[in-house]
Amino acid sequence: TRETNGPTPAPKFYTVPAAGGVEEAMPMPRAFQGRISPDGKRVAYRMNNSWDEERRNYRGGKNRPIWIVDLKTLDLESPPWKDSKDMEPAWLGDVVYFISDRDGVANVWSYDTKSKKLAQVTDYSDYDVKTLDAGAGAVVFEQAGYIHELDAKSGKEHIVKITASGDFPWMMPQWKDVSARIASMALSPTGKRAAVEARGEIFTIPADKGDVRNLTNSSGSAERDPAWSPDGKQLSYFSDKSGEYKLYIEAQDGLTPAREIALPNHKHYYTPAWSPDGKKILYTDTDLKLWVLDVATAQAKIVGEDPWMVPARTMNPVWSPDSKWIAYVKHLNSLYKVIVAYNLETGRAQQITDGLADAAWPAFDASGKYLWFLASTDFGLKSQWLDMTNYDHDENFGLYFAILNKSDASPFLPESDEETGAPAPAAGAGGRGGRGGAGGEAADAAAAPPTNRITPNVSIDSDGLQSRIIAVPGIAERQYTRLAAGVAGTVFFAEAIPATGTGGGGGRGGAGGGQTVHRFQLRDRRATPFLTGVADYEVSADGRKLLYRTGGGGGPAAGAGAGPAMFIVDADRLVPAAGAGRLNATLRTYVDPKAEFKQIFAEAWRNQRDYLYVPNMHGSDWPRMRTMYGALLPSVMHRADLNYLIDMMGSEIAVGHSYVRGGDIPAVTPTNGGQLGADFVIDQGRYKITKIYDNESWNTDLRAPLAVPGVDVRVGDYVIAVNGEELRTPDNLFRMLDGTAGKQTVLTVNTTPTAVGARHVTVIPVANDQGLRARAWIEHNRRVVDSLSKGTLAYVYIPNTGQPGYTSFNRYYFAQQDRKGAIIDERFNGGGSAADYIIDVLQRDFDGYFNNVAGDRMPFTSPAAGIWGPKVMIINEMAGSGGDLMPWMFHYRKIGTLVGKRTWGGLVHTADTPTFIDGGSAIAPRGGFFRRDDKWDVENVGQAPDIDVENWPKDVAAGHDPQLERAVAEALKQLAAKPVERATREPPSPTWGKRLKPLP
């Protein structure tokens, strides 16, 4: 199970009586896999779990030898070892059998603890040996989908014949409700129907009358990204039914066969959109190239691209009303985004914005006069999305538009209401008075809905264009996104609803409430909230209807209970009432798991091919791997087994972060648990409290059930009963606490192990007390450092390089900046961002002083915030990703000394690998790290310490932390060799006012 007395849960061995009873911790601090020797005196074990068990050829810090520990003395021995991945140890007599990949393929090896002889037992060269166990003179293991039995004496092995008979009802084709699996959506040109992608099928849903249609009905292929033709008669979508994604065009009623169009390259495709004249379709691909396809000839060509891959795909191409222009977004080398307009007639692209503001989400006005977009002038620190430096700096956008033709005036020219006398009759005047001024006329013209649907001719005059970019007045800059055009003079844009809560202890906030969609209309010159609680939205081609979707919970606009919901509302009228326009969007499809498994397996293979950060697949023969592992696919009879197979195939690329997760696996309802935030020992058949955890100071997100003032429970008390049920061993306290989290629970406690004189105390258990234990571990370390250094060193723990790590660093580092040096502990660091901010602060030196007129006049340093003495960073094998990079930067910049063990070795980042149709995923890393000398580094290696220190089980069991203690000793040694030179007083006051010549 998990050891919780640390910053993160870690695997640990316990023993429990076979007949049931109280668990007892074994003395090894951490242990993941292993077996007790036949005589019960030793344990052979693997200490570390892995973030990716299927990763092949891994040689990072998590690889450790098999440890064989004497349970009495805690002395260790190990088989000969050098960086290999050794696992699954099991005993036969005095011989330990285990799996090792030391010869390039995971095979069975043995180590004789008496003769100290190491031997290779199997010699497979294709599939790795997987799980292993031993007993009754034989070793059994998994390989190539079979269970093998090997006779230890003869060395002969055979495949064990196993017949597993079952109906496997989950593998039978069946109808499923896939409404919760909506991945993309599109609104028909006049808003009569919505098209959605759900679980790889294309459905259309009526706004009011009619039935839902499934146009595709195929579990064996994935259909994605529907888009309506401008006349509403056809839908296009991408499908991999041929084995690679192609474009299909189908009648919207689904009654005729779809037209298949092969695309020039084998990639994944995004953002399809028909031109308003119906002659072309634009789309983007995996490599951020923008394509335009001629519908008649089926020929496609590249018309633009974004040269920088960032996690969020931001090209967002849109058509002009006359089908002659495409506006899209691209990154400059500054990493700022600009709006670009491509002319299909000339084949030339024109940059609309100058790159001094970050621009996004272009949208042509229906009048053809304006190009709307969002832009930010405080993008700065957000330009590098991976860096921690951009934390706590929100990018705020304003609403802008460019007047495309230099002959057009601004719609924001001054207006004035004036009496003009009796109005002369005018055709089409409709009795409406003029608004006065050229600006009012322009605004009214832009806002007026077209009556004859004449397509405007869009021309973009480059001369003076920058001076014709207008910031829309009266709209405060905020975190806007997702701009879309409506009828002429109308645009919509979304704003994230602020998150609430702490996000689980140190994060940037809890779950948000969706988005508010604002509507801006030129005729009113103002923006108003139009919808709230929105997850996504689309505006119809005529601008008069709006399709939106809410997430789980629905939000205020849903007017319904929990669960996703879709709505079609009028976009050009009053703000819709809550719940108006809700669609009857129950989507059901016939799912054939076998066919779906084949599609998902193929998609997993393609995703690695198309999205991996280097083109050579790390040297893997990738087509052969598809054949090799695909041979096992017919034997897969459960979605979890499919993940296992995909993970094994992906392991051939030998890269970190290639996680395989999720899918349509039956959900298991978790129990709510119940924990008291305390440690216990068994004494005279009772649970005796040996430690009560509190939430230390300033941790408002932690609750300690037994440390609440007024709760009369103390260390040394015995728990006699829980909710009136007497507790005695072998019964288990945690059985009685199961389901009590967040509920009033009555404990009967006493200072003696009897019920006589006991008292009743009402407490509220927590679901998980790991946070309390982690905080206790951190505070214990801080106090140890304070004690060992006699108050001269700070201790700062950094749990990850995400927001919690950023918060923890800022909290602890600057609160201790009166210390002369610092111990930075990043053990068990879970990664996140590139911790450039932390490294910059640690590297900081001061330049001088400003005097202080208070107290004893100790001067301020400039900069004032920092610790100016030695820094020592503690690392271990459980720190990775951003937790690999941070110590690498610390070492590279020569900030200080690294103490501990080599880190994980997983320095690639993930971004935009598409999910599977059933919600699962297999990640293809999108970027890797290499040094300035043009060599890849850290991935599959880790960062080695300057001083290698192991936390041996014997030392840890004795209450020591050798890595922490060695780090303190090193920092004190460096401090003694080079004391911090800091002024404690100011120099003599200057005499600049003294006259050079005395007054007469």
Question: What is the meaning of each model-derived region?
Answer:
Residues T1-Y14, A18, V22-G34, K41-W67, ...:
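A flexible loop/linker signature enriched in serine peptidases of the S9 family
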Residues R35, A90, L132-D133, A186, ...:
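Conserved beta-strand position repeated across blades of beta-propeller domains
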Residues D39-K41, G93-D94, A136-G137, T190-K192, ...:
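Short coil/turn segments that connect the beta-strands within blades of beta-propeller domains
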Residues S165-I182, P456-A476:
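A short helix->beta-strand "capping" segment at the edge of beta-propeller domains
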Residues T671-T729, Q803, G880, G927-G928:
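PDZ/PDZ-like domain segments forming the peptide/carboxylate-binding groove
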Residues E696-L706, I720, E725-G920, V956-Q963, ...:
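Cleft-lining beta-strand/loop regions that shape enzyme active-site pockets
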